[in-house]
Design a protein with these regions (language model features):
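Short, solvent-exposed segments of well-ordered alpha helices
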Residues: 15, 88-95, 109-117, 167-171, ...
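General "foldedness" signal
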Residues: 42, 63, 118, 132-133, ...
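Long, charged low-complexity segments
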Residues: 1-8, 12, 25-28, 48-51, ...
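Short runs of predominantly hydrophobic/aromatic residues within well-ordered alpha helices
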Residues: 21-25, 97, 119-122, 126, ...
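Short secondary-structure junctions and interdomain/linker hinges
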Residues: 35-38, 56, 60, 88-91, ...
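Charged/polar positions within long, soluble alpha-helices
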Residues: 33, 58, 106, 130-138, ...
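Amphipathic alpha-helical interface elements
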Residues: 68-152, 222
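Internal, Lys/Arg-enriched amphipathic helical interaction segments that engage polyanionic partners
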Residues: 1-99
């Protein structure tokens, strides 16, 4: 696809208006960001762009914030994460979980993905959502300290899913939190060099975080009085 608009004479505008392929996607992404920042309201043009991307079978769509492009994801998966973000935003005890999860999603699936940020924001989303449940009196709680709290006081926590006799109800939640925490390779540096998260691991981290945020904000994981 190529822009068929007569380009102005200056070199920058000429390159902009004659972009194609990946370059054109970058142009569209940048224009959407500019439009949102400048608060330009053009619903008709946005709908036309959405229709063009759909009809062309593009791997990208206009994101929910209308400020950029994002890679297409199965609608059911995207809608589940969107619902989790909306629900978390309505739970005061979840703090900034919704904002962190939304940022993580965009960093993982946006036109210019940032795996390190996506993973970091995923952890922050879970920390925000779980704080009031796991360590409500710890002002500087992290996912690491919360895992320590679970390990030291397992009997204090319950989950909505029935657990067979003799089984530990908090273990599945703990395992997901542990996987997310231990999987962050960029947290610390060392002599061998810091290893950044891959895009695949960052995207997996976002979905782990979405599930955990939903559990904590919905009351599926609770702390006994």
């Amino acid at each position: 696809m190529r822009l068929r608009i007569a380009a102005p004479s200056d070199d920058y505008a000429h390159r902009l208006f004659n972009s194609a392929g990946a370059e054109l996607l970058d142009v569209v992404d940048s224009l959407l960001a500019y439009r949102a920042e400048a608060r330009i309201v053009q619903p008709g043009r946005l709908q036309t762009l959405t229709d063009l991307l759909d009809e062309a079978g593009s791997a990208y769509r206009v994101n929910d914030g209308l400020d950029g492009l994002e890679e297409r994801v199965t609608a059911a998966v995207r809608d589940a994460v969107r619902r989790t973000i909306a629900d978390a935003a309505g739970v005061p005890a979840a703090g900034s979980a919704a904002d962190h999860l939304a940022t993580a999603w965009q960093a993982a699936y946006g036109r210019r993905p940032d795996p390190v940020r996506a993973y970091s924001e995923s952890i922050k989303a879970v920390e925000s959502a779980a704080h009031a449940v796991i360590q409500p009196r710890h002002g500087r709680a992290t996912l690491g300290t919360m895992l320590g709290e679970i390990g030291n006081a397992r009997a204090k926590f319950t989950v909505a899913v029935p657990t067979p006799a003799g089984k530990d109800p908090i273990a599945p939640v703990e395992a997901m939190m542990r996987t997310l925490w231990d999987g962050q390779t960029s947290r610390h540096g060392n002599q061998g060099g810091t290893v950044s998260e891959s895009l695949d691991s960052a995207r997996a981290g976002v979905h782990f975080a979405a599930a955990l945020v939903q559990w904590f904000t919905s009351g599926a994981v609770a702390r006994n009085p």
